Amino acid sequence: MSFLVRAPFSARVLPLAEVPDPVFASGVVGDGRALLPDDDVTCVTVHSPIDGVVTKLKSHAAIITSTRGPSILIHLGIDTVGLRGRGFAPLVEEGDIVDAGTPLIHWDLGPVRGAGLSPCAPIVVVNPPGEPVSPEFDEALPTVGILDPLFSLPDSD
């Protein structure tokens, strides 16, 4: 049995190696995939990709930890911490219990694009460290809808 991670929003799927940030691209944070919203998308509601607990929440990022073990980082954009929250509206708090599909953050892409930053959003397994993931989408058509299967990893049970 495997642990399934779903897409938190509709977007084009990229391998981490294509993320314009050397830390994410090298896989040092963990394995996963990245989502790139289409150019005509102006706002995104980011949903939890798994059932779990919001263990860390910043305006531009969240970590959801499953009761089954894995922790998933959703990082919205590259170098977006410098926006100091502009364009991000958290909809949950740390400690909240969420289901896959629970809205986490409302993301206005205007400030990201206006600052010349990349809206590329890494979705990464941060725990267990070094755990490789398997794609769960059609790599020939690398787009996903909200809550479509994105990737899986071996179940820790």
Short names for language-model regions:
Residues 1-157:
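Contiguous, well-folded functional domains in the mature portion of proteins
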